[in-house]
């Protein structure tokens, strides 16, 4: 049995349009040039008096992405700012992301050498400790999503992270950067 030429043409048009229906692979925001803002974390991280945690891209070196980690201590006036270089490394589709930070950042922000990538898209990222399934998390977004966290990312943060707390990035953060 032969298909009429019009059916073959219709099948070809349908099949050739399928790639445009799918979305492309998201770009991991921790290794691209976007500025990232910490907008949530697990209560157990106890980031006492730390505000405005912002990570900016600096470049790449020896397979690692260099980023500035800027944050402020919200005690007293004016806020006391802190800045340090961190290094992150992530292999495409890997479940783990490596991080190298200074002792000061490790103390102030309780950073770890490795994180589980729970969820990411082009503009948001949920990281957690490597310990176990219900380990402390952090939620990062680009400026575009400061007021509107993507639904899948938000759901991941809320359901997979113990005692999630949302933080705010207000205008003081940009004044004290």
From Swiss-Prot:
Example GO CC term: the record gives: extracellular region
Q: In which tissues is it expressed?
A: Expressed in salivary glands.
Q: List the disulfide bonds.
A: 52-173, 137-161
Where would one find the signal peptide in this protein?
1-24
- Tell me if Electron transport is a UniProt keyword of this record: no
Q: Where would you find this protein in the cell?
A: Secreted
Please list the residues annotated as glycosylated. Answer: 154
Kindly state which keywords UniProt assigns to this record, in alphabetical order: Disulfide bond, Glycoprotein, Secreted, Signal
Organism's domain of life? Eukaryota
**Domain remark text:** Each monomer contains a pocket that accomodates cholesterol. Cholesterol derivatives (such as epicholesterol, epicholestanol, epicoprostenol, or 7-dehydrocholesterol) could also fit in the pocket with minor rearrangement of the side chain. Since arthropods are unable to synthesize cholesterol de novo, it is likely that a cholesterol ligand would be bloodmeal-derived.
Q: How does it assemble?
A: Homodimer; non-disulfide-linked. Each monomer accommodates one molecule of cholesterol in a pocket.
Q: Which family does it belong to?
A: Belongs to the calycin superfamily. Lipocalin family.
Report the function annotation for this chain: Salivary tick protein that modulates host immune response. This protein blocks dendritic cell (DC) differentiation from monocytes. In addition, it inhibits up-regulation of costimulatory molecules and pro-inflammatory cytokines in response to stimuli and promotes up-regulation of co-inhibitory molecules and the anti-inflammatory cytokine interleukin-10. It has a pocket to accomodate cholesterol, which may have immune-modulatory roles, either directly or through interactions with the host gut microbiota.
From the Swiss-Prot or TrEMBL record, give the protein name: Japanin-like-RA1
Its ancestry begins with: Eukaryota, Metazoa, Ecdysozoa, Arthropoda, Chelicerata
């Amino acid at each position: 049995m032969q298909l009429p030429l019009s059916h073959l043409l219709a099948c070809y048009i349908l099949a050739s349009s399928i790639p445009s229906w799918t979305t492309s692979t998201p770009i991991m925001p921790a290794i691209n040039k976007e500025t990232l803002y910490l907008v949530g974390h697990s209560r157990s991280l106890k980031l006492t008096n730390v505000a405005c945690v912002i990570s900016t891209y600096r470049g790449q070196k020896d397979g690692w992405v260099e980023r500035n980690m800027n944050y402020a201590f919200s005690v007293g006036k004016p806020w006391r700012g802190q800045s340090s270089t961190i290094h992150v490394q992530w292999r495409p589709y890997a479940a783990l992301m490596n991080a190298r930070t200074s002792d000061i950042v490790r103390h102030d922000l309780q950073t770890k050498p490795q994180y589980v990538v729970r969820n990411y898209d082009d503009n948001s990222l949920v990281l957690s400790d490597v310990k176990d399934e219900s380990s402390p998390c952090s939620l990062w977004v680009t400026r575009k999503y400061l007021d509107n966290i993507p639904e899948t990312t938000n759901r991941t943060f809320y359901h997979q992270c113990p005692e999630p707390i949302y933080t705010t990035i207000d205008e003081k953060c940009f004044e004290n950067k």
